[in-house]
């Protein structure tokens, strides 16, 4: 009996007997895609990874089953089962040949034979035991409420990659647990804006807010350091109703004489918020901001010296925003001496989610000091190995910036020796 027949005749009937796919809210996902397969050149890829079965309940992945044909030993798939569970951040995983079942608890590091598959409710209770303390009940209720909101699939054209779903889940869990400084570290090109959108979408439709009373949807601020990033995010959030989205710009503030407050999801750049609210901006000022030059006068002043009432962000009450998403947060926004820090300190009651592609290093350690360790990370090498990013090679080249040979017609201050190759160290001595 081959693997396909083993699945059809033995494994799937056993899973369906346990209620997977028939119990309300449960799904039996067959051939669940995990990776695309690393690009290996000439339009070819390595073999992509698929889990034979993923067990979903209440919009959460809570089980994996790795199948082998009946004639193989039932534990032959244990290594794959563990690998898939680790990638998908699933606690319970199973290996089977249709005749016997081997179960693994990834959290407790226990494993052994099991007589049958758990039902959806049983596996849910195994994964998320019913809490007894009141505060844990409230946390569990918010988790279930947030995860019950489906992903916004853009008409069936978008499905989260496994690491995107992991990142979204980790943030929602942390918010449910009342954590207020969060960090996601994901390589460039892995879809951080899409992740941010889905987080905002779920929070909005679950009516989460800082009071956690479910009485209203949250007010969310997406804060970037460049207009192009703020504009891209604004466009990426277009599944929200048009009147829910607000692009905060100097032109609109100047036109209305105040910052906009009617809306649900706001987008702006730090420079707009750090503009002096009492200062008239002329066309040249607006051009400077469009060029995103970080040369505003208070940039070197400690945050504690700022009078927040003097700046646009100070027109908002401290608790106006429930969630602030800081894009490219490694660019200095969390440094104690940074003018950007004043914004985050002003809105300190909000949950603040930092997005970065930069792993922790000496030069950006203060970002990690401020937000803490990432709730989820996805590295560049992971994206390449999984086939979501293209491999690259570093090639060293010399440019005209590195070396210079004088030719007739060049205007240079100083004395030049014809035919000599000047290096970068010579430039300031010519």
Language-model segments: what does each one mean?
Residues 365-430:
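Interdomain helical connector at the RecA1-RecA2 junction of SF1/SF2 helicase-like NTPases
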Residues 313, 332-351:
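Short, conserved "post-DEAD/DEAH" coupling segment immediately C-terminal to helicase motif II
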Residues 233, 277-279, 329-340:
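Conserved ATPase-coupling elements of RecA-like P-loop NTPase cores
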């Amino acid at each position: 009996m081959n693997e396909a027949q083993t699945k059809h005749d033995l494994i799937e009937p056993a899973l369906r007997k346990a209620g997977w796919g028939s119990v309300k809210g449960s799904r039996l996902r067959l051939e669940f895609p995990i990776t695309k397969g690393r690009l290996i050149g000439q339009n070819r890829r390595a073999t992509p990874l698929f889990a034979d079965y993923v067990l979903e309940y209440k919009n959460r992945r809570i089980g994996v089953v790795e199948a082998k044909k009946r004639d193989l030993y039932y534990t032959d798939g244990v290594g794959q089962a563990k690998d898939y569970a680790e990638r998908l951040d699933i606690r319970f995983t199973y290996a089977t040949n249709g005749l016997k079942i081997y179960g693994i608890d990834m959290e407790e590091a226990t494993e052994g034979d099991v007589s049958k598959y758990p039902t959806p409710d049983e596996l849910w209770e195994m994964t998320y035991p019913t809490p007894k303390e009141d505060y844990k009940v409230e946390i569990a209720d918010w988790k279930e409420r947030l995860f019950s909101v489906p992903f916004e699939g853009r008409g069936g054209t978008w499905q989260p990659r496994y690491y995107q779903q992991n990142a979204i889940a980790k943030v929602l869990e942390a918010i449910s647990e009342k954590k207020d400084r969060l960090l996601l570290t994901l390589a460039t090109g892995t879809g951080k804006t899409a992740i941010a959108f889905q987080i905002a979408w779920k929070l909005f439709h679950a009516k989460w807010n800082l009071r956690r009373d479910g009485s209203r949807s949250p007010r969310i601020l997406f804060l970037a350091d460049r207009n192009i990033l703020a504009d891209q995010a604004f466009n990426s959030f277009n599944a929200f109703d048009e009147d829910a989205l607000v692009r905060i710009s100097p032109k609109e503030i100047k036109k209305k004489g105040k910052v906009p407050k009617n809306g649900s999801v706001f987008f702006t750049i730090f420079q707009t918020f750090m503009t002096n609210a009492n200062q008239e901006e002329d066309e040249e000022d607006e051009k400077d901001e469009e060029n995103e030059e970080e040369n505003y006068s208070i940039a070197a002043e400690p945050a504690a010296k700022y009078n927040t009432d003097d700046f646009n962000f100070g027109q908002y009450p401290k608790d106006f925003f429930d969630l602030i998403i800081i894009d490219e947060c490694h660019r200095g926004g969390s440094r104690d001496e940074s003018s950007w820090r004043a914004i985050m300190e002003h809105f300190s009651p909000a949950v603040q989610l930092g997005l970065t592609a930069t792993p922790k290093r000496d030069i950006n350690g203060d970002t990690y000091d401020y937000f803490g360790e990432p709730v989820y990370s996805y590295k560049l090498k992971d994206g390449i190995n999984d086939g979501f990013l293209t491999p690259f090679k570093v090639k060293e080249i010399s440019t005209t910036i590195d070396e210079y040979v004088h030719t007739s017609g060049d205007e240079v201050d100083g004395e030049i020796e014809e035919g000599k190759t000047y290096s970068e160290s010579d430039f300031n001595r010519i």
